[in-house]
């Protein structure tokens, strides 16, 4: 099936959430889905409906909230098993346009050691389950898992059977990120040349980044006939991650003259090669990073803090004279507004609200009031408040779960010599204020021990990191942490000019998520109802 543009299939909420420690609750998934819709993705893979009640709820809520007539296609993953497919069909039912994505392994190593089935059995199952899914929706995607290590001739026959049974998209996963661009491009070319009926389906690819080749392999696939790319925001995902949405989109945007002829267009065509609103890329990256607790490395292409920074004097001189000397894209193209309008302590609510709208944030009255109070507090501490600061405040104040425990006060005493001591005052779910103190190896350790004495939620702190929001001695610091309890991970995030305060708030943010998960196990995902399902991943 020929397409003159690329279909962007976003799997941040499914494969991306499989990143270690990237657990999201249903509210957070809906918030990300809303932003993905604003970003302009064609398909949102909202989850694996059969895996757990929490996954089912998240897929259903995304379908109901974002799956409008003019919104993206909402998809659920399903093994090639009737119960999986039925759950997927039920979960995506509220969407105006739904898709079932079913899969089964086709590599000999998977058939022998995981499925314990013959090639003939797997081929028959693939055809039967695609036909079964077709009974629920017209839009059915089929994936031969571990296609990259499957025997080509057998892979061709399985794809033929899936297309004959009604698959409208056939997705080729490099499940373990093993192939090189030349090999993967050759695999896609072989499919276009040897699979009967391939013209009736869209060829999709799903590349993992184990060797750092996910984007390169995806581009090679496009050159050889693929017209859908499965990707995630910030490239998050299982193990080393997936193909990065922002990198694949901007590669096509910046190198449009190279890719236009591949899509059957004149080389000088200025029509975008995807439906993505690139100005939403940076905001999408920040939101996913904030909600998953997965920091973006500074040198990450497109969205890293250093992506548009120049340290070399020669480079700086060239950029000052003409940005094109050392930059191949404009930062504003991806939503990084370099004309950072500065607000101060005399700026009023209307100016603050107006700037939020210009930055792409639309807050309700309650969120706006909290954010404005934080802004005024910050403006009293800093001479000027930049857009970077405002974005950090917004990320901090938009709460998708109830704030059961609220920080009222934190004081620390430390120095050399001396024993770091912290006093913490909290308000609990019952509205009662509690105070306690503790000593630790450092001020943050003392604060966390004091909080643990006040909140009896056993957990293991597995990650703590601090990043500067802006330059300067009065810069805000962003603290991101992760805690683990019973195999589940919860992230916390906070920003403040005082790192100790930010650390306390980040820890409470994570503990509030943990508290909410224990009180609402279905809403937050809870234990997997079908762990065998979640164990199989593209």
Swiss-Prot record:
Q: GO molecular function of the protein, one example?
A: 2-isopropylmalate synthase activity
What CDD domains does the record tag this protein with?
Answer: DRE_TIM_IPMS (cd07940)
| Reaction it catalyzes | 3-methyl-2-oxobutanoate + acetyl-CoA + H2O = (2S)-2-isopropylmalate + CoA + H(+)
* EC number(s) given by UniProt: 2.3.3.13
Keyword Nucleus in the entry? The reply is no
Q: What keywords is this UniProt entry annotated with?
A: Amino-acid biosynthesis, Branched-chain amino acid biosynthesis, Cytoplasm, Leucine biosynthesis, Manganese, Metal-binding, Transferase
Please state the protein's primary subcellular location: cytoplasm
Q: The Pyruvate carboxyltransferase domain covers which part of the protein?
A: 6-277
**GO process terms (BP):** L-leucine biosynthetic process
User: Which Pfam families does the entry link to?
Assistant: HCS_D2, HMGL-like, LeuA_dimer
Positions annotated to bind Mn(2+): 15, 206, 208, 242
Cofactor names from the entry are:
Mn(2+)
Subcellular localization: Cytoplasm
What does the similarity note say?
A: Belongs to the alpha-IPM synthase/homocitrate synthase family. LeuA type 1 subfamily.
Q: How does it assemble?
A: Homodimer.
The task this protein performs is described as: Catalyzes the condensation of the acetyl group of acetyl-CoA with 3-methyl-2-oxobutanoate (2-ketoisovalerate) to form 3-carboxy-3-hydroxy-4-methylpentanoate (2-isopropylmalate).
What name has this protein been given in UniProt? 2-isopropylmalate synthase
Q: Which gene encodes it?
A: leuA
């Amino acid at each position: 099936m020929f397409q003159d543009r690329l279909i962007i299939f976003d799997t941040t909420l499914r494969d991306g959430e499989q990143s270690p420690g990237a657990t999201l609750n249903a509210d957070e998934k809906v918030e990300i889905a809303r932003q993905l819709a604003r970003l302009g993705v064609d398909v949102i893979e909202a989850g694996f409906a059969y895996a757990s009640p929490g996954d089912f709820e998240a897929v259903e809520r995304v379908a109901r909230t974002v799956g409008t007539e003019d919104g993206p296609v909402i998809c659920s993953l399903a093994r090639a098993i009737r119960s999986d497919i039925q759950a997927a069909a039920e979960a995506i039912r509220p969407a105006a346009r739904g898709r079932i994505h079913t899969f089964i392994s086709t590599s000999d190593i998977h058939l022998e050691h995981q499925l314990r089935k013959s090639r003939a059995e797997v081929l028959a199952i693939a055809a039967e389950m695609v036909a079964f899914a077709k009974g629920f929706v017209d839009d059915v995607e089929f994936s031969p898992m571990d296609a990259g290590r499957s025997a080509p001739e057998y892979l061709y026959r399985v794809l033929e059977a899936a297309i004959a049974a009604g698959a409208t998209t056939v997705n080729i996963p490099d499940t373990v990120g093993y192939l090189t661009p030349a090999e993967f491009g050759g695999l896609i070319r072989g499919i276009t040349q040897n699979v009967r009926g391939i013209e009736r389906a869209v060829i999709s690819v799903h590349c993992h980044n184990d060797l750092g080749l996910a984007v390169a392999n995806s581009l090679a696939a496009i050159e050889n006939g693929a017209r859908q790319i499965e990707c995630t925001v910030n490239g998050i995902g299982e193990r080393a991650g997936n193909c990065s949405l922002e990198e694949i989109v901007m590669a096509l945007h910046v190198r449009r003259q190279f890719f236009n002829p591949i899509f059957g267009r004149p080389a000088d065509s200025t029509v975008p090669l995807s439906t993505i609103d690139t100005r939403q890329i940076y905001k999408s990256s920040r939101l996913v990073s904030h909600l998953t607790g997965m920091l973006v490395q500074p040198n990450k292409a497109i969205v890293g803090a250093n992506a548009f920074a120049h340290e070399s004097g020669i480079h700086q001189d060239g950029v000052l004279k003409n940005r094109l000397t050392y930059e191949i894209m404009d930062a504003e193209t991806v939503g990084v507004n370099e004309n950072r309008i500065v607000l101060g302590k005399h700026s009023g609510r209307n100016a603050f609200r107006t700037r939020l709208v210009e930055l792409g944030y639309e807050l309700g009255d309650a969120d706006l009031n909290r954010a404005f109070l934080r802004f005024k507090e910050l403006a009293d501490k800093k001479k000027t408040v930049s857009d970077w600061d405002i974005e950090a405040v917004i990320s901090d104040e938009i709460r998708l779960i109830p704030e059961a425990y609220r920080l009222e006060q934190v004081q620390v005493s430390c120095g050399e010599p001396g024993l770091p001591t912290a006093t913490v005052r909290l308000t609990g779910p019952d509205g009662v204020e509690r105070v306690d103190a503790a000593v630790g190896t450092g001020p943050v350790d003392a604060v966390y021990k004091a909080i643990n004495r006040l909140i009896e939620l056993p957990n293991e702190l597995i990650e703590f990191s601090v990043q500067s929001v802006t330059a300067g001695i009065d810069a805000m610091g962003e603290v991101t942490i992760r805690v683990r309890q019973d195999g589940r991970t919860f992230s916390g995030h906070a920003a403040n000019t005082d790192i100790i305060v930010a650390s306390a708030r980040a820890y409470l943010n994570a503990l509030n998520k943990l508290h909410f998960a224990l009180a609402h196990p279905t809403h937050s995902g809870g234990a997997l109802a079908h762990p065998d399902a979640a164990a199989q991943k593209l």
